[in-house]
């Protein structure tokens, strides 16, 4: 149930191959994604379980989808079929940020599916307040929220999983200034532009991946 039928067939064939290879071991299948990717993860996990790609002659292996910031993907009939697929080992965990509007759409007749885990990144002392729709939907902010938990008093936020807060600013300006992390720092060196011998700048075109990585390293780091 991917964007193109052949993509779905290719993915399912690979799952069947791996299940067959490791059928005598303890196996679990995990599918994950963010935003539209989370919707695809939900559909893919459902496809695997409903069509028995997680089964062998002697076992049914669990299939789990971790869907971050997923829009709704089906109506009442799909929800019913997905709930029924739980008997075939399917579990779906939808992680949503309280300020993110994407998981609320499309509206009815679309339905929420699976189990819902709500986080609230606005409670984080690391992030600028109040934030905006880009920050609330950003995957790194989601992972920051999942890595934390309310304090014992329930009035604050603390990290319970060691995760670098600098990652929050990979593509946005979400961290408070006091942390000294530049906004949107995750970019290729000079965005892939290189200066030629003639003094002109052009987009790097390397066929060899090692050459590409070497050219994109900052001269300061070489």
Model-found features: residue ranges?
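Serine hydrolase/lipase
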Residues: 1-32, 42, 46-222
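Catalytic nucleophile loop
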Residues: 37-38
């Amino acid at each position: 149930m991917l964007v193109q039928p052949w993509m779905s067939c290719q993915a399912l064939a690979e799952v069947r191959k791996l299940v067959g290879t490791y059928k005598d071991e303890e196996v679990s299948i995990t599918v994950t994604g963010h935003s539209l990717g989370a919707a695809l993860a939900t559909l893919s996990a459902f496809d695997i379980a409903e069509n028995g790609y997680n089964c062998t002659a002697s076992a049914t292996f669990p299939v789990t989808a971790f869907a971050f910031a997923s829009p709704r993907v089906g109506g009442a009939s799909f929800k019913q079929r997905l709930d029924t697929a739980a008997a075939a080992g399917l579990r779906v965990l939808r992680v949503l940020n309280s300020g993110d509007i994407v998981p609320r759409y499309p509206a009815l007749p679309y339905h929420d599916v699976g189990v819902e885990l709500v986080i609230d990144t606005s409670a984080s002392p690391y992030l600028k307040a109040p934030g905006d729709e880009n920050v609330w939907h950003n995957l790194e902010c989601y992972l920051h929220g999942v890595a934390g938990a309310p304090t014992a008093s329930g009035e604050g936020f603390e990290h319970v999983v060691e995760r670098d807060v600098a990652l929050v600013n990979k593509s946005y300006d979400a961290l408070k200034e006091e942390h000294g992390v530049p906004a949107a720092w995750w970019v290729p060196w000079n965005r892939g532009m290189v200066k030629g011998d003639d003094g002109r700048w052009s987009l790097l075109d390397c066929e060899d991946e090692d050459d590409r990585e070497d050219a994109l390293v900052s001269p300061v780091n070489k």
